[in-house]
UniProtKB/Swiss-Prot annotation:
It is a multi-pass membrane protein. GO terms for biological process: urea transport; water transport. The gene is TIP4-4. A motif (NPA 2) lies at residues 197-199. Keywords: Membrane, Repeat, Transmembrane, Transmembrane helix, Transport, Vacuole. Aquaporins facilitate the transport of water and small neutral solutes across cell membranes. GO terms for cellular component: membrane; vacuolar membrane. SUPFAM superfamilies: Aquaporin-like. Its main location: membrane. This is Aquaporin TIP4-4.
Amino acid sequence: MAKFALGHHREASDAGCVRAVLAELILTFLFVFAGVGSAMATGKLAGGGGDTVVGLTAVALAHTLVVAVMVSAGLHVSGGHINPAVTLGLAATGRITLFRSALYVAAQLLGSTLACLLLAFLAVADSGVPVHALGAGVGALRGVLMEAVLTFSLLFAVYATVVDPRRAVGGMGPLLVGLVVGANVLAGGPFSGASMNPARSFGPALVAGVWADHWVYWVGPLIGGPLAGLVYDGLFMAQGGHEPLPRDDTDF
């Protein structure tokens, strides 16, 4: 069941909130700069044709590393969301107010746009900023489903390895979240582009002026993210610890 907390406009004047919003802007800027930059670099090295197994692997690795580092860097300041789907996935269970969520999303979109503007300036002689696009033969509804499933897995991992106080991974949560992102890029990249992040798609689309099927990269993640939060919070968060396996000398 959703547990939305509305919040209040006074949050905007709170020093902690201001720092958190600024952190989201900077973290998202750095994430998108590395993520989109890696796609541009693979395309440049491949002579404009970066859609290869090697190119996909390189982009997946770049996203794995930058997500792990940026989430870790921002965890103690803003939560290290860098993604509107993560923000709304946490808002759905009352872990962040809707007012602060709106500030986070605005900062994430601005950070993404600034990163892409800088990349476009740096790569002025090349083909421009790449945008997410559906693969050949993949319709919009299939794209939405793919993005929803990929984002569901991302948010499920966020809850299990970062949010859940019973997590057994210590400080490895951000790394594990990064690994899920990388795996999802490998799995979904050829089909939907594996965005999982409306901000990651918004900046390139705005700077490039290409909006074909852009709605897919909002609808899919914003279905999958909150749904994962509600499922994990409702089924697993409130439950007690798991039953330990019986030892060899234990009678059944």
